[in-house]
C-alpha cells in the first residue's frame, strides 16, 4: 500500500520492504537496528528478512548484537527451572508481590517446553519505575537464576547477562568443588563480564525442611535478598502471606515448612570469580557418532538454540517432516540425585521398574556370554531367580542421564531386613554406571519369551 501511494511520483522516496517475525520469532531491538543499518547503505537490500539466517535465498540482513534499551530504572531477570519444581509459580507470586505492594510496573512471560513436568522452563521478568513497553523476551538480563545445575552444561544460561550482572545457581557443589565443576565457558563469561556469582544448595535445604524437591520458595527468597528489588522485610512479609493463601488449607505443618523455606533463603554464598578465568580456552564438544539430523538440528533445538539455526538446516523438510525417536538422544542428566543399586539387598521383585514413570530403571537378565562383554563385574550381579533363567545373571540397571530423580523407586523398594536395595546418590557419583545401561539396552537380548509377562508385576518388567 505504501509503495502504491508513491507509484509514479518524481519525488517518491526510496522504499524497501522486509519481513519480520518469521517462524514466530521475537522481533528484538537488534533486528530493528539492522533494518536502519540496511537503509543507510548506498544500495539498501529490498525484500529483506530479519530474525533468521537465510543462507538459501540470502535475503536476511546481517545480525547485530543485542542491546539493552530499558533504562536504569528497569530491572530485567531470567529464571531457568525444571517443570513442576515451582519456579514459574514462585515467579508469578513475585510479580504479584512487587506489583501489589510498590508503584513499580511489572511484566512477566513464561516459556515451557512440551515435556511440562520435568521439562525446561524459562521465566522472563521486568520491573521498573516507568511503563514497560518491551514487546520481546528478556535478552539482556541484569540477573539470571539457574535452578538446575545440569543446565550449566546443557544451555547457554549466561547468554546476554549484562556486564556487572548477577548470577544465582542452585547447586549441590560448594566453594572449590563448585569452581572445579563449572564449565570453562561459564567461568570465562563470569570473568570477562565482571559477574557477581552466588550459589545455594536449595535441594538440600528443601529435603531438610521436608519439602522434597520443591525448591521454589527457597530460591524466591534468595532472589529478593540478593537483588533487593524491593525491601527484603517487605518481600519476606508478603511471601509468607502468599504461603498462607496458597497452602493454608493443607494444614499448619505445610505452612510452617514453607515459612522455614523463606527464612533459609538467606543461606546463599558468594563465589569468588578468578580473573584468570578470562584466559580459559572454551572447547565445544560434539558427539560425531550421532546421525547428521541429530547433530545439526535436534541438538541445537534441545539446547534452546533453535532460533540460531540457518535456513539450510531444514532443506528437504519444508513440509514439516520430522524423524521419530529423537528423544532417545537427549540424555539430559537433569536430576540432582539418582538411584544407586545395591545388589546385596535386592530380592528381584522389579517393583522399582514398575513404578518408574520414565522407564529409567529396568531389570536385565544376562547370559554368560553377554556378561563377559558387559562393563560390569560378575560379582556385582545376582543369580537370576527362576527356573527358566538358570545359569543367567540379574542386574537392575539405571539410566542415570534420563532419570528425573523423583525417588519413586526408592520409596517402593522392600529391600532385605529393612535395608533398601536402592539409595539416592548425587548424579556425578553415578555417571560411571551409564555405560552399563547403554550396553544392556543395545547388546542384551530380550528374555520375555522365557517368562509369562502377564502373570505378575515382576515378569511384566521383562517385556520389551
Whereabouts are the PLM-identified features?
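Structural signature of the thiamine diphosphate
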Residues: 25-64, 257-275, 279
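C-terminal non-catalytic interaction/assembly regions of soluble proteins
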Residues: 1-29, 41
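Short beta-alpha connecting loops at secondary-structure transitions
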Residues: 16-20, 204, 245-250, 393-396
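Active-site cofactor/cluster-binding pocket
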Residues: 1-4, 9, 71-83, 87-303, ...
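Short, Gly/Pro- and small/polar-rich lid/capping loops
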Residues: 59-79, 456-463
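A generic structural motif
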Residues: 12-21, 47-53, 107-113
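Short, glycine-/Ser/Thr-/acidic-enriched flexible segments
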Residues: 20-23, 55, 82-85, 130-132, ...
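Ferredoxin-type iron-sulfur electron-transfer modules and their immediate structural context
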Residues: 235-239, 248-402, 410-464
Amino acid at each position: 500500500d505504501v509503495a502504491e501511494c508513491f507509484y509514479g511520483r518524481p519525488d517518491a522516496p526510496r522504499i524497501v520492504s522486509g519481513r519480520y517475525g518469521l517462524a514466530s520469532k521475537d522481533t528484538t531491538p537488534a533486528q530493528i537496528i539492522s533494518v536502519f543499518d540496511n537503509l543507510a547503505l548506498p544500495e539498501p537490500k529490498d525484500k529483506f528478512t530479519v530474525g533468521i539466517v537465510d543462507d538459501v535465498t540470502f535475503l536476511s540482513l546481517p545480525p547485530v548484537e543485542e542491546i539493552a534499551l530499558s533504562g536504569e530504572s528497569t530491572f530485567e531477570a531470567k529464571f531457568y527451572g525444571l517443570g513442576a519444581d515451582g519456579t514459574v509459580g514462585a515467579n508469578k507470586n513475585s510479580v504479584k508481590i512487587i506489583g501489589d505492594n510498590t508503584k513499580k510496573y511489572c511484566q512477566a512471560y513464561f516459556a515451557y517446553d512440551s515435556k511440562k513436568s520435568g521439562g525446561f522452563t524459562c521465566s522472563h521478568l521486568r520491573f521498573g519505575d516507568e511503563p514497560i513497553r518491551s514487546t520481546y523476551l528478556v535478552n539482556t538480563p541484569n540477573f539470571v537464576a539457574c535452578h538446575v545445575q545440569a543446565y550449566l552444561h546443557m544451555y547457554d544460561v549466561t547468554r546476554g547477562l549484562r556486564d556487572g550482572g548477577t548470577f544465582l545457581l542452585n547447586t549441590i557443589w560448594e566453594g572449590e568443588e563448585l569452581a572445579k565443576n563449572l564449565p570453562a565457558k561459564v567461568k570465562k563469561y563470569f570473568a570477562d563480564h565482571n559477574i557477581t556469582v552466588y550459589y545455594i544448595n536449595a535441594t538440600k535445604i528443601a529435603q531438610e525442611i521436608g519439602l522434597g524437591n520443591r525448591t521454589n520458595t527457597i530460591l524466591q527468597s534468595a532472589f529478593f535478598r540478593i537483588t533487593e528489588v524491593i525491601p527484603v522485610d517487605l518481600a519476606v512479609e508478603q511471601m509468607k502471606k502468599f504461603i498462607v493463601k496458597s497452602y493454608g488449607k493443607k494444614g499448619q505443618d505445610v505452612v510452617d515448612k514453607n515459612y522455614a523455606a523463606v527464612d533459609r533463603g538467606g543461606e546463599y554464598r558468594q563465589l569468588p570469580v578468578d580473573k584468570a578465568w578470562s584466559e580459559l580456552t572454551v572447547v565445544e564438544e560434539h558427539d560425531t557418532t550421532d546421525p547428521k539430523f541429530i547433530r545439526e538440528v535436534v541438538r541445537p533445538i534441545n539446547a534452546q538454540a533453535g532460533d540460531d539455526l540457518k535456513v539450510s538446516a531444514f532443506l528437504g523438510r519444508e513440509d514439516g517432516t520430522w524423524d521419530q525417536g529423537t528423544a532417545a538422544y537427549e540424555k539430559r542428566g537433569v536430576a540432582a540425585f539418582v538411584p544407586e543399586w545395591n545388589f546385596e539387598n535386592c530380592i528381584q521383585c522389579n517393583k522399582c521398574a514398575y513404578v518408574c514413570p520414565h522407564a529409567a530403571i529396568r531389570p536385565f537378565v544376562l547370559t554368560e556370554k553377554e556378561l563377559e562383554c558387559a562393563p560390569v563385574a560378575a560379582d556385582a550381579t545376582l543369580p537370576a531367580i527362576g527356573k527358566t533363567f538358570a545359569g543367567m545373571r540379574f542386574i537392575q540397571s539405571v539410566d542415570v542421564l534420563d532419570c528425573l530423580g523423583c525417588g519413586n523407586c526408592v520409596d517402593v523398594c522392600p529391600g532385605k531386613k529393612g535395608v533398601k536395595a536402592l539409595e539416592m546418590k548425587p548424579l556425578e557419583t553415578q555417571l560411571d554406571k551409564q555405560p552399563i545401561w547403554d550396553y544392556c539396552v543395545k547388546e542384551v537380548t530380550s528374555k520375555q519369551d522365557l517368562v509369562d509377562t502377564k502373570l505378575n508385576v515382576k515378569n511384566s518388567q521383562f517385556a520389551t
